[in-house]
């Protein structure tokens, strides 16, 4: 069960690895101890809800040493808002996320975490990932399970932005009910992404590596 394990001193967390990170970093193996840089964002419960619907973790929060960033607000206006890189921690599990000031003392993380930095293959992008990540936010854990997660996505109205019956923002989102899971003995060399129709910006199917990461609770 994700969030707990047979050993009550440990917990299992779902981690999503996309095609880009699988190219940048050495693929994980079951039973291997890894040191990873992980991230979470406020869209994770919606984006990765199918990965492990039951996974929720309350994390204590501290401010990262990384500088303040700016983003476009969710109401669709063009006035940028500040966000503070922050670190969530649950036992030995840590992850980075962007917090709206003031930085909260706790957050409820759900959906899944994402791999941002791992053991680099040859390449400047992989090494740069650790430069961009807060070194004090890394997590060391054991890989307990590997699965291939295949999801369909399409351009759909974005609930984060205002819209009407004939206008509004559309963003690429996962199609509910399209998910497929396959148990893996080892990680694939690459992950697929392919168009399902000839329509421009039409539906696509994309593969992800889903890792059960065990850490001390």
Residue ranges: model-predicted function:
Residues 53-217:
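Long protein-protein interaction modules used by eukaryotic assembly/scaffold proteins
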Residues 9-20:
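Short, structured beta-strand/loop micro-motifs enriched in basic residues and often containing a Trp
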Residues 2-10:
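Short, Lys/Arg-enriched N-terminal segments with co-localized hydrophobic residues
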Residues 40-55:
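Short, Lys/Arg- and Gly-enriched loop/turn segments at beta-strand edges
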Residues 19-28:
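Short, surface-exposed secondary-structure edge patches
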